[in-house]
Amino acid sequence: MELKGKRFLVIGGAGLIGSHTIDQLLKEDVAEIRIYDNFCRGNEENLANALKDQRVNIFELGGEVIHRDILSTAMKGMDGVFHFAALWLLHCWEYPRSAFEVNIAGTFNVLEAMVENRVKRLVYSSSASVYGNAVEEPMQEDHPFNNTNFYGATKIAGEQMCRALYHRYINTDRSFDYVGLRYMNVYGARQDYRGAYIAVIMKILDNLEKGKPPIVYGDGSQAYDFINVIDCGLANVSAMKANASDSFYNVGTGVRTTIKDLAEMILEITESRMKIQYESGGMTFVKNRIGCPAKAEK
């Protein structure tokens, strides 16, 4: 899609990936960026710079994806939609019913509102959680869905709804294009790291700032693909620009980093004399997840 003069709705725009996507979108000659957010996880501080631009506004009537009529109203006149709103991994673990209503039914509501309003393109925020533990590394997009947690299940459902409704309305006046992005382990500025399983980089830095050692659960052999949120924002804007449709892409570096190596790297960079503190337990949903970025790079 040509972005010049276009209007975009960013659902979940006050969150980590959403706010960085807005920052990148503002570098384009777009006409309007409308933010639809309930500010449950996101906050206006994340939007401080973006809101200085007159092209950016927060939709004032609400920001819940479960409110179908308000969501549809927010989508009127939009050319494209970025959909980031979702309950995070641990909330899905603790509250699966709410996760179903927000992540699955909410995504259906987004798609339904797009069809009603003839919005032409969607960038859907999926997740590497659809893969679960890697059967083979690096994981390509045709890697089997090895997921065993409810968050991953909601993202698989979201992908399949995008595909099903795309094919239902193709070659009609309600047709739309979409792409889904499967982010690897995202880190960076504005990250909310209250959850026990996320934001390991920020938690290590936070401990060091407090004079505490970095904590690593188990032996630290868990390995992930870490991607900076700025790169995720760039990927989202590129996905909106692209001609590709009805497809999913990994967003990662393809670099395998163990938690032990990561902690040692941070200690070296910060010139800290702290030693890694190994602890048993800790909630770990996957132990190895490294994506292949080749398809997205093309």
Q: Residue ranges of each PLM-predicted region?
A:
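N-terminal Rossmann-like NAD(P)+-binding domain of SDR-like oxidoreductases, especially those catalyzing
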Residues: 1-184
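C-terminal substrate-binding subdomain of Rossmann-fold SDR/epimerase-dehydratase oxidoreductases
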Residues: 28, 208-298
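Residue-level signal for the nucleotide or nucleotide-sugar donor/cofactor binding architecture
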Residues: 42, 66, 94, 102-105, ...
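A conserved pocket-lining segment of Rossmann-fold NAD(P)-dependent short-chain dehydrogenase/reductase
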Residues: 92-93, 173, 178, 182-193, ...
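Active-site loop immediately N-terminal to the catalytic Tyr-X3-Lys motif
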Residues: 96, 147, 193-194, 243
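Short beta-loop-alpha junction of Rossmann-like oxidoreductase domains
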Residues: 133-135, 189-191, 287
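Short glycine/proline- and charge-enriched loop/turn segments
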Residues: 137-146, 187, 199, 278, ...
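Hydrophobic alpha-helix immediately C-terminal to the catalytic Tyr-X-X-X-Lys motif of short-chain
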Residues: 157, 161, 165, 200, ...
